[in-house]
């Protein structure tokens, strides 16, 4: 499975599988219709990163470049078969 390296003081390895499953569980818990998952993930990626990092006890810093976020969204959409 893909590992995305997020820049912080040092690089944090983010498992696309773990993060995708975390998002999937959040969407299921909130009863978001599956046909809107793609847009919801794209629109709320910062929210999901923040929630995931809090759960992992990692300090969240929202200063991640847009290209990296696009790569992360694409990887999540692919993992969840939303493309």
Q: What function would you assign to each model-found segment?
A:
Residues 2-35:
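N-terminal acidic leader/helix
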Residues 22-77:
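Acidic, low-complexity, intrinsically disordered interaction modules
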Residues 78-83:
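Short acidic DE-rich linear segments
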């Amino acid at each position: 499975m893909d590992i995305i390296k997020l820049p912080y003081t040092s690089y944090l390895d983010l498992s696309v599988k773990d993060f995708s499953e975390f998002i999937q569980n959040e969407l299921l818990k909130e009863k978001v219709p599956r046909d809107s998952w793609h847009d919801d993930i794209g629109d709320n990626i910062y929210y999901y990163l923040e929630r995931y990092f809090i759960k992992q006890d990692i300090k969240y810093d929202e200063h991640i470049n847009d290209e990296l976020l696009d790569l992360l969204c694409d990887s999540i959409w692919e993992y969840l078969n939303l493309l």
